[in-house]
From Swiss-Prot:
Function: Activator of cell division through the inhibition of FtsZ GTPase activity, therefore promoting FtsZ assembly into bundles of protofilaments necessary for the formation of the division Z ring. It is recruited early at mid-cell but it is not essential for cell division.
InterPro entries linked: Cell_div_ZapA-like (IPR007838), Cell_div_ZapA-like_sf (IPR036192), Cell_div_ZapA_N (IPR042233)
Protein name: Cell division protein ZapA
GO CC annotation: cell division site; cell septum; cytosol
Amino acid sequence: MSQSNTLTVQILDKEYCINCPDDERANLESAARYLDGKMREIRSSGKVIGADRVAVMAALNITHDLLHRKERLDQESSSTRERVRELLDRVDRALANPADAGEA
């Protein structure tokens, strides 16, 4: 089992100490850098004032992107499953009727 250690990350000029298993350290550091970048991007636009509001906007933007990608992957997965079913049906028909295999 992984041992937990405290990791200090800096997000929008503030330090946060987070308890994190060793095997998740790199992922957490990467997530913190990503969040910091998104929050700085929003803050630099000048349209959102206050760290709390910047954090909420960053969370909404990241969540929107995540859900959009998940939806796209779900559609691609569904399309791939359908294509595999079609190919399996063709194989089954070809095996059932070897004389007709060249016509499909």
